[in-house]
């Protein structure tokens, strides 16, 4: 687990992010701080508990596209690559790297769920 994380000011000071409730913003910071080197978080339930926030705050982040859900146990920070670049000599492989195959990465670095050739056909 890394001891440092970075945050993109373009995201953190955007009107969209700043319009989220303060507890949802706080939750996002804590999720990012506890993510692995690919942006996956598997202890999100514990984070909700120790922050004392309701599941609804996570739903704000999901609905706004800041977090991607994988089943009941794993979340992914959608803008992880926009926030952090991990040097190869410091990188720790994620236990969830297989889930990356279900995603596409936009030109700006944002993860989105893959829709097959949908994105490819939209660029034509």
Regions found by a protein language model. Give the residues of each.
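Short recognition helix of helix-turn-helix/winged-helix DNA-binding domains
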Residues: 1-38, 77
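Winged-helix/helix-turn-helix nucleic-acid-interaction surface
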Residues: 1-11, 51-124
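Short secondary-structure capping micro-motifs at structural edges
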Residues: 15, 45-46, 62-65
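Short, well-structured alpha-helical interface segments that form or flank functional binding sites
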Residues: 22-26, 42, 53-59
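Generic detector of isolated residues embedded in canonical secondary-structure elements
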Residues: 26-27, 46, 60, 76
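Short acidic, hydrophobic short linear motifs in intrinsically disordered regions
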Residues: 35-51
């Amino acid at each position: 687990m890394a001891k440092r994380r970075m945050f993109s000011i373009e995201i953190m000071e955007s009107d969209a992010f700043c319009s989220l409730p303060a507890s949802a913003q706080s939750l996002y910071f804590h999720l990012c701080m506890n993510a692995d080197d690919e942006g996956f978080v598997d202890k999100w339930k514990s984070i909700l508990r120790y922050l004392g926030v309701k599941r609804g705050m996570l739903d704000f982040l999901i609905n706004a596209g800041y977090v991607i859900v994988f089943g009941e146990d794993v979340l992914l920070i959608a803008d992880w690559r926009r926030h952090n670049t991990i040097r190869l000599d410091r990188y720790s492989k994620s236990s969830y790297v297989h889930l990356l195959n279900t995603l596409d990465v936009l030109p700006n670095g944002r993860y989105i769920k893959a829709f097959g050739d949908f994105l490819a056909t939209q660029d034509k």
